[in-house]
């Protein structure tokens, strides 16, 4: 998992409340047995004018020119600005996978669905909760100025606007540690690899029958 320390990126405003995970990555794409390739289908039913299917070549599909991520001014955005209750609905982990693979490092909103919020941290996407007043202001700024960028300093727990205004946000110490060090669940486990190996070796000595292979 990629480390998250300080990130500066273009902001894309998604001005919709209660965006559920089926909107983020529609159900038909969950058939895949891989963890990759979901970025092209992020917000599939909003980005495209036709119905998408797994394995389809998205480069030939008709796009919805009115959808925010299809507008040239937001091309390459790495920060998604959203409204309240973002990520509600089913608990599919494919939702943060799709956001990450599209290129979003962070999502800023007044509130998130609990499971989606947790899944973001496990997959390298930083979900940031700001007040509705602060989010309203950022929407106004993003829409008023082309190329509007924000800087996110995870160590300082601040979102910094171009004029220097800093918005503080909360993050649990353990989740912050994992993102700063690029540690997912597997990475955390591997930090204790020596202890795991030592335990397994000791267990075999005490319970040798565990190592017996049946014919």
Curated annotation (Swiss-Prot):
It catalyses: (2R,3S)-3-isopropylmalate = (2S)-2-isopropylmalate. Disulfide bonds: none annotated. Pfam families: Aconitase_C. GO terms for cellular component: 3-isopropylmalate dehydratase complex. Heterodimer of LeuC and LeuD. Belongs to the LeuD family. LeuD type 1 subfamily. This is 3-isopropylmalate dehydratase small subunit. It comes from Polynucleobacter necessarius subsp. necessarius (strain STIR1). The gene is leuD.
